[in-house]
Amino acid sequence: MRYSQYFIPTVKETPSDAEVISHQLMLRGGMIRKLAAGVYNYLPLGLRSIRKVENIVREEMNRAGAIELLMPTVQPAELWQESGRWEQYGKELLRFRDRKDTEFCLGPTHEEVITDLVRREVKSYRQLPINLYQIQGKFRDEIRPRFGLMRGREFIMKDAYSFDVDEKAADISYDKMYQAYRRIFERCGLKFRAVEADTGSIGGSWSHEFMVLAESGEDAIVSCTACDYAANVEKAEARQSAVTEHADPRDMEKVSTPEKKSIEEVAAFLAIHESSLVKTLVLLADNEPVVALLRGDHELNEIKLKNILGCDTLEMAGEEVVVKVTGAPTGFAGPVGLKAKIIADLAVQGMKNFVTGANAKDLHLKNVNLGRDFNVTTFADIRNVVLGDPCPRCESGTLEMWRGIEVGHVFKLGTKYSKAMKATYLDADGKEQIIFMGCYGIGIGRTVAACIEQNHDENGIIFPLPIAPFHCIISALNMKEDVVREASEAIYGQLAAAGIEVLLDDRDERPGFKFKDADLIGIPMRIVVGSKNLADGKVELKCRRSGEVELLSIADAVEKVKAAVNAALK
């Protein structure tokens, strides 16, 4: 490919609305252009990397025994109503009506469609197991699309769905996909962790997220210093201490805390540690008030609480509801005397003589004790873990924190969709059985963006060779010189004939301009062809990642590029 005939609209300035480095560099490198909020054009250079990831995904899916198909983006509402997700999914589901007033949605995922297809076609255990996948555009009406391809509204995704006769067989399918995902991200050249995760709106009994490690990541993940335990913060647990304070209960008393609303303010005012307070949070679960209690230095994990309550919606209550439930403004709530359901974190269970709000403005209670002063409906793990918490899986490790970008997610769905939608088969005895399912997603564009977050420097992108738009760029310093043009064309022809994806920069531009563009778009290897070095029979070969520069003969440079590509793609 010749640069002068290609479409790579690079820009030197960083766009003001691009917050993260991948968004900045993909815009500057002429890889994407914004059409609307969270909706992008994939330009030729960006599309080449997208296709590279798709091909790796397709190869590994096929290797794992999955079969490719393609489903419609437009989905009928009746399928979502049948599964129970039409209302549950919320405003991210873009709904519309056609001219006949029939309701549809733009698919953010395809569990309903694939389950409907399989229940129509699969009748016998002899047709199972089967794993079907597609690579297709999706749409989720994100409330705040941001970060370019990292959190868009329209995006490219690989989604696969496995169907099995029972849970044991479904576990085998799950493990096949888990291992396939590891191979995919290894082949893409990414540093990643597979972590335990909440199943969210997809549902099911178990899931893992594949997280690319990056400081810019939106997700917090934890891992153990001593074993292989890892989870995202929504799912992460800490080993619960059996320690109970043995102090004798003291008389409860009211103390004045004028305008001291926050945990930090109250702790400082009373000269106590934040862990000696219990915070009282009022929430609405499916619009019904519920109270959560946590140790003062801990934070509520709304996902854990939502799962415990089994509600569809959970949100912090507004001031009006807080006053109605507690009789006091926000900041002075406490559990004593409340009639609402109270869910307390496990860390509260062993506390004695703690401080809470008094359910009256500018007042708190000291020496509050469980059982004597109030009762709890349920004790459960409802907090976020913190750095240094003991690992829940081993005796010696503690938890450390990382930032990550979710690029893949695998789910054990069990019978969530097949039971709701009556997807069944006849077993060997002719009895009707419910199909067990799994689903498995990879964000294709997000994988490219995450790769850039992990692979860049001050000059631009440093693509891993397997997903780089081109393997090598030839920077011809002056194509008007016969010797430079002939040598550049010869190198280009030899590399192309060997199957190397090569971009010949034949533009009439200054050398420095060409070098900056080559660094910006992140092509792994650069051959510089100039008359000065050609006089000695040499060209310059530079590695984008290491910055190493070598003067080599044309033959040696070509062989070195071929060897590097073959090694990376084998």
Swiss-Prot record:
It catalyses: tRNA(Pro) + L-proline + ATP = L-prolyl-tRNA(Pro) + AMP + diphosphate. Its main location: cytoplasm. GO terms for molecular function: aminoacyl-tRNA deacylase activity; ATP binding; proline-tRNA ligase activity. It comes from the Bacteria. Coiled coil: none annotated. One of its GO terms (cellular component) is cytosol. GO terms for biological process: prolyl-tRNA aminoacylation. Keywords: Aminoacyl-tRNA synthetase, ATP-binding, Cytoplasm, Ligase, Nucleotide-binding, Protein biosynthesis. The keyword Heme does not apply. Its EC number is 6.1.1.15. Consists of three domains: the N-terminal catalytic domain, the editing domain and the C-terminal anticodon-binding domain. This is Proline--tRNA ligase. It comes from Geotalea daltonii (strain DSM 22248 / JCM 15807 / FRC-32). The gene is proS.
